[in-house]
């Protein structure tokens, strides 16, 4: 049975509109990931947006529960039903039907469509919800309905806001399989399994905790697809269902192990985590040191550790991820489209961690031998695993689980000190919903006329302070928000900053417009008051002249994305952008740095489209039609049924609500300033065009002229080479005196950092000066750490030593027994590399 389709069609026949699964990254500052089906309807439930014309909805929502408040990561693999990624089937009513219909629909679907026997079904209700109890009595015997307290059967969105009792449907999986002391209805065992939760949103909880009835009660339900699939197939574990068979087969082929072996938990961890990695990467989340990217990294590293347990010492997860992309291709087409990119990024991340995994495991296993009687693992070692070898703390705890041990958290935290808290996110969200409830009830969306004009007559509908409390009048020097009846000011969005400008009253400048933002469908402009304004005043709204420069950079961004896809491949997709009047910044998915040739091609392609003077075209069409035409869209964006499409003939076509130039010739010229890495799998290009392009060329010509004067040579290359040779000769004079030199058992040990000079020549001079030597010198150059090491009459090989330390820096080394060099890009790990280099030298001399 196709449970997903069966569910959606059932509720469609009951008058519900089918909504697609929203992205795993929600536009909600309170959530790390989308963790429930109701997330995309949150603004409807809280009254921030009007109820849709069809007040019934249904969806099959992809959810993530790893990191943040809802975190199942540590349980995955060890329980029958926990997942990091899963699908939640749900039906929703926005002030339409309530308890009676919700219970009727649920019972009908469970017993008729899914075919579960009524005798096996049990119900829980809130202890004070007599109404739900009586409704359920129509379908099940009273002794199979259990009243429970707030902990189990009361749901609320937060400390305040919509809330209400809930009712859950359980199924008895049979006494023969479950005979534990907790395997009774209401116990903690697995015999009675919850399959569906019906939330009856009928109250509003105030800030002081008082419950008031909602004028229009609503329904929010959730049922796990993976759990239902297992039940229908009479499986006692979600991972034993047909949904996971293709993944288990792939893991079995990779490991030459049987799923039913002692490694079953590891099979399940890898299968689950492969699904999460595939979907997160395909939806634009990339491996990072913080926020969502760090959660993704933790998931991958946990799966690699379980692969290591099964004997896999090389990258393997990317192959399981590839199976996930194929498995879900029919229902989530973007997975198949991005399969190559997803597998490649996964492979590169695996390689990085595998370089330190084995060394980290050796340290872990060695430390296990010194566990104290209380089974407390040294917090300092846990921190070293975290800081030097990239082992997330939860991974170390997961490894300790089988030994009945745990990390000394006090010791770990003391070592952490001022380290960046990696699991903290840095994402933008909306303002507090409570700020806007009264405003939304009082005002209709204002009219945006900025596509047609940069100036218009308007009326000030209202003024608001920084907390969005309404003001009737304003005074000079105040900063306030204004809501205009109609506005030419474009609100920040699509990477473009909000418009600035001025408000005129009686032909005088009454206020400066500092910024414009959209909150829940209303365009607000931030004002600096110069002349007192009050509610109802007639004003002239004028957009500043910088609007044209912003438009140039916005259109150039579209051309840039098109050029990147042509040069690098169709896997390139936007991962973020910033469009200002003097520059643009574009983040995109790509696994490695662009070389000079690629950057030149991209820049040339953009300028070629500029010189063609291509006219822009704006169309409005259904979303599916736009995608059929090849329009590029942001995966994380939630689009309406009808969308705005901006195209520059054959050069570019994108879904976009922003301001653009009428033809590409107005952009003037385009110049890439910098290409860099943002995080694993994400690159960034910074560029200028228009006036900023001209100003840059002017400044560079001036600098070149001054350089020729300083070098006293019109041939700049020759002059620079002559200067470099002079500097090089001066640096050969001596080894920097600040390099620490210790003598241990007759051997000179030098480990340190220099800011300038040729570190290879320094090693040569040290070797000439000392009879016995172990030396490693580090130097930071741009975004990279270089090192050189020399060994003379000492019990260690230089190339082994260099490679070991380079791995900490995220790089590799090579060379001879007496000399080697290496480098890496992980600048933050310099101190850890210094410590490791010193420790290796000391241990070698202690033997």
From Swiss-Prot:
Localization (cell): Cytoplasm
Residues that bind Zn(2+): 554, 558, 656, 660
Reaction(s) catalysed by this chain's protein: tRNA(Ala) + L-alanine + ATP = L-alanyl-tRNA(Ala) + AMP + diphosphate
GO molecular function, one term: aminoacyl-tRNA deacylase activity
Top-level taxon of origin: Bacteria
Chief place where the protein resides: cytoplasm
Cofactor stoichiometry and binding remark: Binds 1 zinc ion per subunit.
Function: Catalyzes the attachment of alanine to tRNA(Ala) in a two-step reaction: alanine is first activated by ATP to form Ala-AMP and then transferred to the acceptor end of tRNA(Ala). Also edits incorrectly charged Ser-tRNA(Ala) and Gly-tRNA(Ala) via its editing domain.
HAMAP family: Ala_tRNA_synth_B
Protein's name according to its UniProt entry: Alanine--tRNA ligase
Species whose genome carries this gene: Helicobacter acinonychis (strain Sheeba)
Gene: alaS
